Amino acid sequence: MEGIQTRKGAEEQGSKGEIASAPLRPRSPASGKKRVLIIGLDCAEPSLVFDKYRAEMPNLQSLISNGAWGEIESTTPPITVPAWMSAMTSKDPGQLGVYGFRNRADYSYEKMFTANSRAITEPAVWDYLGRAGKQSYLVGVPPSFPPKPVNGGMIGCFLSPNAQSKFTYPENLREEILRVAPNYLVDVPNFRTDDKRALLQKIYEMTEDHFKVIKYLVKEKSWDFLMSVEIGVDRLHHGFWKYHDASHPKHEPGNALLNSIHDYYVWLDQQIGGVLELLDDDTRVIVFSDHGAKKMDGGIAINEWLISEGYLVLEEKPQGIVPLEKVRVNWNKTRAWGSGGYYSRVFLNVQGREPNGVIPPADYEKVRDELIAKICAIPDDKGKPIATRVHKPQQIYRATKNIPPDLIVIFGDLYWRAVGSLGLNALHTFENDTGPDDANHAQMGMFVYHDPKRDLGGRELRDLQLYDIAPTVLREFGMDAPGDMIGKAIQVG
């Protein structure tokens, strides 16, 4: 397979920095039809794109050098869902009512829902463009399963069961996709695995097929706006960061996978180049990520801590490591419980709100403030402070639709993750309760803008936010951003 051969070549030469790189090929003459292409790279780390690997990524380097670029701030929390939709609606997670992949469905103790496309009720860029008669094609923009009607086409994201499901709109678009890429993957089967070589192979195969589909859409469809999101970057970081980062606590010097992230980035740039060479001079290009990546030093067992502090009371001692929902909780004595992930959410047990609420409403803010102070004081495993941030949703969002968590916890500036499981018998853990995972998300992503008719001279942009993406796209089509969008069109020149 072409992509894997390219990767092997990169592995052989990557450590010497000798990878051959062709310059960006000239574009086709202008067609007179203004278009915008977005290449989304889930989790792409700005320090790698703008610094460490930049010289070996000639296609992105060309966009950067002739365009405008900068770091872009993600949502709080910096999580794929809702970050991509915050970018494309210019609404914060509270306004969307989506605080992560899993959200409370009601005020019971058990019922949660996974935020799929139906959870997003705010209009996105393509909705506004569709009303103006413009056609959009979307590839893997989370969350996009089930696919929604759009003036154009939509291919479901990694939340789709597989490519055999009804993961496209219109439904017959699926047949076209499978003709172009018969083994199309919406995601790799399991990125938290010890079989690293098999994972790496699947990431390459998946990404190559995604770009085959993007090129097909560029060439064969009538479109004004085309956007893709490549999830392979995220899966690569979570699976291979310890090999790439010498400061990672689990780094393995000399491991054969040492250059796995480097080689993929260089190869990915070639895939991007294959798309760029199909574009005319009336197509503006944006490349951005929803957040960045950084090493993960370890995990903090939020529910173990809540037990030790007397906030969470169990009816039984766990036998082994188990999720909270598998343990009997004494809700009549419990004041708070938490969930794990790349960040934590803490929920309070409030009288008149939860079925067995114990915190009087008059004490709600006092308990929240008490928890904030205590959680921020949790040290690392050596007793050192770790710069944890704890947020009240009502203070960081413009609205809090649906059921927000009572507290959002960012442990150790995202160098630490939250572990919700019980039975660890320790506050700190260095094994992921959901499988091997080397990286956490970073607050800053990357942004590149390129207009082939304007040489912006590689201007560095500052103070960018994900919320600015939607107004920027609308401006490219001569449309004003609706007044309820919270971002602003990025001034690139």
How would you label these PLM feature ranges?
Residues 209-270, 343, 348-362:
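Active-site His/acidic residue clusters
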Residues 59, 370-377, 446, 468-476:
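Generic recognition of well-ordered alpha-helical segments
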Residues 33, 46-224, 231-238, 488-492:
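Active-site-proximal alpha/beta segments of enzymes that process anionic O-linked groups
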Residues 1-16, 24-31:
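A cross-taxon signal for low-complexity, glycine/charged-rich
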Residues 38, 225-229, 286, 448:
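Structural motif
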Residues 413-460, 466-468:
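Low-complexity, glycine/alanine/valine/leucine- and proline-rich hydrophobic stretches
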Residues 34, 41, 48, 55, ...:
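Secreted, luminal/periplasmic, and some membrane-associated catalytic domains
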